[in-house]
Amino acid sequence: YEINEAFSGSTVAVLKELELNPATVNVNGGSVALGHPIGASGCRVLVTLLHEMIKQDKKTGLASLCLGGGEAVAMVVQR
């Protein structure tokens, strides 16, 4: 899982609500550590996810972004 956690409090809530193992989320560091450039967060999150899926030989991944105004978007990708 690659979650844009620029607002890290919401990420904690998502992990809890979806019962995700924190060890499987943002394994190379998230947006707070790596950055979340305006207009490029989605690209950064998706490319990081795709590279990690190849590295771990995973077939399915999930990328999500928080957006301004309390909105969000998510994408499931398969390879």
Regions found by a protein language model. Give the residues of each.
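Claisen-condensing/thiolase-fold acyl-transfer catalytic domains that form or cleave C-C bonds
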Residues: 1-79
